Amino acid sequence: MNIKRAKEEIEHTVKAYLAKDALGEYAIPAIRQRPILLMGPPGIGKTQIMEQAARECGVALVAYTITHHTRQSAVGLPFIRQRHYDGKDVSVTEYTMSEIIASVYARMEATGLKEGILFIDEINCVSETLAPTMLQFLQCKTFGNQAVPAGWVIVAAGNPPEYNKSVRDFDIVTLDRVRRMDIEPDLQVWKDYARAAHLHSAILSYLDLHPQNFYQINADVDGTQFVTARGWEDLSNLLDTYEALGLKADEALIRQYIQHEKIAEDFSAYLDLYYKYRDDYGVEEILAGQAKPAVFARLLNAPFDERLSLVSLLLSGLNNRFTASRRADAAADACYAFLREAKLGFATLPDDIPDGPATLFNQMMTDYDAETRHQREAGLLSRDALATRLKVYAVLRQWEAELRRAKAVGTQEAFDLLRTQFQSLSDERDAAQEAAASALEAAFDFMEQAFAESQEMVVFVTELTLAPAAHAFITENGCPRYFQYNKDLLLDHRKAALQQELAAEERRHGGM
């Protein structure tokens, strides 16, 4: 099973386990809600899909790496309590609440969400003293004498023994009480995530050329060398920041993330070439419709990996513009909705209240900011959604300052001022949309002149289809040449599939 399918299964499980019947009781009794056990190599994204699943299901998440805990923190600390049993006063041992269970209740209070996912990582790597506690947790959904609160779905994760020497095998009694999912690395599935997460285009381009270097764990006499999906993503974030700061990422830095000597060396060399191609070919000039004639001459003798790198650079530039357009559009839509609410609020104000509109606007802003903080704390905002809300709040602060500067007293006067401010934001949205559309047309002009209907054009159109930002932009704004090339590509695929079916049919008849 790949990581995408595992995420879907977790989301479906959360919805099923939290579904209620007509009486308000959980449709599946807690005793029949089997914990999910994810088994897969390290760095594949098990923890990350838990965050995504919780956010998309609108529930809370408490995540623990159990190897960081002792038996006392998992079960609770013992203390003596006096009891009266059968006419006798006796001293009995009881336990404080488990730190993990306490964290669940604390999360419920902090977020206001009463249902969620309790995720325990590295569950099969615990110490000998904690192993019985983990078995009890999976079998009975308790830590010590404290049960996991109702409405919380249990998900655990572990590594197969070939990746971790500390692994302890579960017995059949435990395995018969869980839903086990075995996860394997899958580059194509990871690339779908990487496109949506805006991972660095050099990494995606490199892995297109060297898919075998996506995920490796090799043990030799010098120790274990490895590269994981987590390593590529963390490196991507650093590369983006280094570029923004004007810093150079060398091989020594890359080795800190890609802890496989040959792959780190290979990617470092590719990254240097990638930046060189960006400068030599003038990618920004191409997207501005000003490609130099020398570029076409150079491409005639360029090797395939160089041509593919250039296509990747063009796609990266386009996706940056598509993302900017989408974010400008989202911010404008949110500000427009806020403006409509403000108009309704202004209608309730008497005209003679000093700073009435500005004061009301400030209160609405405060409520908006509080809602953002709450959703952020609850983990319900994606990176893009958070960026949009922060952008909107910054715009609203500017609008409030204009209201106070203009000393608008009348509600109509205040609304007219805000409407003027919104027009500037709307103009920014239109400019971002126009910049993206113009760059897309320039890119197609270049691709047609440089590559015509070659394999590079197939890659270009395919990536536009698969990249969420590109697909959304083209769907909303259109692009005749994209639709034509995409149609031709689909026809070619169908024709090839039909030819394969006919060939298979002929082989079957030939063998009779």
Model-derived regions, located:
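Terminal-proximal interaction/regulatory segments of ATP-powered molecular machines
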Residues: L300-M512
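Charged/polar, solvent-exposed surface patches and flexible loops
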Residues: E8, H12, A16, R55, ...
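Generic hydrophobic, helix-prone segments enriched in Leu/Val/Ile
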Residues: I10, I100-V104, Y242, A436-A443
